[in-house]
């Protein structure tokens, strides 16, 4: 199907606008399952307007030396690849301690390797735990008076960051390099509380939008990007299209560590945000 543009068109017409695509490395050795098919698949998605998320399973000693290469390949295809979601391997079945230690890799391990393999363009300090986005959800929820999907998962479940390509240097510039994320999140949380306590939500949101520029260092902001305007559109329009404008300019890097019987954490399971619904109507954490 990767080499069949008609198949891609049928998938798109059926309503699919984004594909999660397994992509474990940039060589045939690390990614034997679809190394040769990937360029054709991306070309088919490009022609049909379907966006792609690369999903590499990361295994220590197997492909952990190619994390930077995966990000660079995504960079070359940013018109269609909008995210890379790394998944440190889940070790299933019977496995001795030595074998586990050979293959086990954690979220912090991956983040450290990414810093090394991107020559410091994406550092360990550029990442945030997933629930950090809750203040943004809270202020949108307060303004719209409608419940929104909350990523209130356990802090150790995963991490993420946004990186942008400087139009002139072609180097990555992480969001944290030119935006005071901590200050912005505190503003969102404070204004959400003001709206909930009865303050006029329209005046409050206008104040939020007005203050956004103060959190952005325009001198360090990548050429061709207006982050404050982009954030304002997301807050005021609250639509998928406004979020899409963000992705066109940037690349999301995510990390989710799936659990196995050797590192199972009940607190993480209880706070999972993604679930399977079984035929007998049980809800099982992803």
Label each residue range with its predicted role.
Residues 9-15, 41-45, 96-109, 129-142, ...:
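Short secondary-structure transition/capping segments
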Residues 53, 83-86, 123, 277, ...:
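A structural signal for short, well-ordered beta-strand segments and their strand-loop junctions
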Residues 148-286:
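Radical SAM enzyme core and accessory elements
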Residues 58-62, 134-140, 247-253, 259-262:
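Short linear motifs at secondary-structure transitions and domain/linker junctions
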């Amino acid at each position: 199907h990767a080499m069949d543009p008609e198949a891609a068109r049928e998938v798109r017409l059926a309503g699919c606008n984004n594909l999660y695509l397994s992509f474990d490395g940039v060589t045939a050795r690390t990614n034997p399952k679809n190394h040769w098919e990937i360029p054709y698949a991306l070309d088919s998605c490009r022609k049909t307007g379907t966006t792609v998320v690369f999903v590499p399973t990361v295994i220590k000693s197997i492909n952990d030396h190619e994390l930077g290469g995966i990000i660079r390949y995504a960079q070359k295809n940013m018109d269609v690849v909008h995210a890379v979601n790394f998944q440190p391997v889940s070790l299933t079945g019977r496995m001795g301690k030595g074998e586990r230690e050979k293959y086990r890799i954690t979220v912090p391990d991956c983040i450290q390797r990414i810093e090394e393999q991107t020559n410091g363009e994406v550092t360990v300090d550029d990442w945030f735990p997933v629930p950090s986005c809750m203040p943004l959800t809270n202020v949108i929820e307060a303004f719209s008076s409608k419940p929104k999907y909350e990523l209130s998962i356990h802090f150790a479940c995963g991490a993420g960051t946004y990186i942008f390509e400087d139009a002139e240097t072609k180097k990555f510039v992480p969001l944290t390099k030119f935006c005071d994320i901590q200050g912005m999140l505190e503003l969102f949380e404070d204004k959400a509380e003001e709206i909930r306590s009865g303050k006029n939500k329209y005046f409050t949101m206008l104040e939020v939008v007005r203050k956004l520029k103060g959190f952005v260092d325009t001198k360090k902001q990548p050429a061709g990007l207006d982050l404050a305007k982009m954030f304002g559109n997301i807050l005021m329009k609250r639509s998928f299209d406004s979020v899409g404008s963000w992705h066109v300019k940037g690349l999301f890097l995510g990390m989710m560590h799936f659990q196995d019987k050797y590192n199972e954490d009940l607190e993480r399971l209880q706070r999972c945000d993604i679930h399977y619904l079984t035929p007998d109507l049980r809800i099982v954490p992803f």
